[in-house]
Amino acid sequence: MKEFQTLKGDITKTRIFEGEIDLDVIDDDEIIVRVETFSFTANNISYGVAGDTLGYWQFFPAKENIDDQWGCIPMWGFAKVISSRHKEIQENERLFGYFPPSDYLKLKPTKITEQNFLDAVSHRKDLPIISNKYLRLDGAVSYTHLRAHET
């Protein structure tokens, strides 16, 4: 697994964390997604600059970060569920939402509808709901309609 990390005090300094992830280590009611694509824009740079002030570093704590010097700048993107222990979320579902610049992310879906769910992982509970909501693209009418017109 690879994860792009930024030095919180100087976002021009970066590193790639490489480690193993055991896709079978997953609790009941959790899912693991593989991040497929994301966008990195000027807006994301502002997330890094305001990371501590606005709480952006709390969304996805950096791995192997004992001294809390490194962070993961959040990005909007697409992912696919590759492992699920949640009875309402199926493997191979596609999602749109807030992701770290990483290969994988573990989520704990709650308040599930056909169109979306919230992530209930404890370190994100006090963060803005809009950034904790994941669209379930297979159930999103507008997305399905757009995909039907692809050639």
Task: Give names to the regions the model predicted.
Residues 2-9:
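OB/S1-fold single-stranded nucleic-acid-binding modules
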Residues 9-44:
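A short N-terminal beta-strand-loop micro-motif at the entrance of redox/enzyme domains
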Residues 24-38, 52-106:
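Glycine-rich beta-strand-centered segment in the early N-terminal region that forms part
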Residues 42, 47-54:
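Beta1-alpha1 glycine-rich phosphate/pyrophosphate-binding loop at the start
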Residues 45-47, 92, 116-117:
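Short, solvent-exposed secondary-structure boundary/capping segments
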Residues 105-131, 135:
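Short, compositionally biased
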Residues 138-141:
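Long, glycine/tryptophan/cysteine-rich extracytoplasmic
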Residues 144-151:
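Conserved small/polar residues in nucleotide/adenosyl-binding loops
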